[in-house]
């Protein structure tokens, strides 16, 4: 929970979905120039002068496959925070997160590179020019 609070404080865009006071979904994003140590954030920092990195997205299990992820991404894509910047995200490919890979491709993200982080983990880097 402390890590999540830290990320929210560092974020330049975040959105939360609530039902009856309970958070059922969230998205946390960061612009360039943040002190974020994530190797994935650092990857995009080296590639772009201006970007918005999608760091965390979550939907509560009971609310999966209801379009909430698409709703949050659509809200982000049409926000002033994402105008004239490249939206950046990474998705695990080892272990494979096929639903997320397909989701990002469906909404227009393009695969730019895959990177082996260690013997257990590999990620795919995606970008959307907004």
Can you name each region flagged by the protein language model?
Residues 116-130:
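C-terminal "cap" of GNAT-fold acetyltransferases
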Residues 70, 94-113:
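Conserved active-site alpha-helix within GNAT-family acetyltransferase domains
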Residues 1-20:
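Active-site rim helix/loop that mediates acceptor-substrate recognition in acyltransferases
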Residues 59, 65-78, 106:
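Conserved acetyl-CoA-binding loop-helix of GNAT-fold acetyltransferases
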Residues 55-65, 92-94:
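A short, internal acetyl-CoA/4′-phosphopantetheine-binding micro-motif in the GNAT/acyltransferase core
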Residues 28-56:
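Conserved acyl-donor/pantetheine-binding loop and adjacent beta-alpha core of acyl/acetyltransferases
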Residues 80-93:
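Conserved GNAT acetyl-CoA-binding A-motif
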Residues 22-25:
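Glycine-rich acetyl-CoA-binding "A-motif" of GNAT/NAT acetyltransferases
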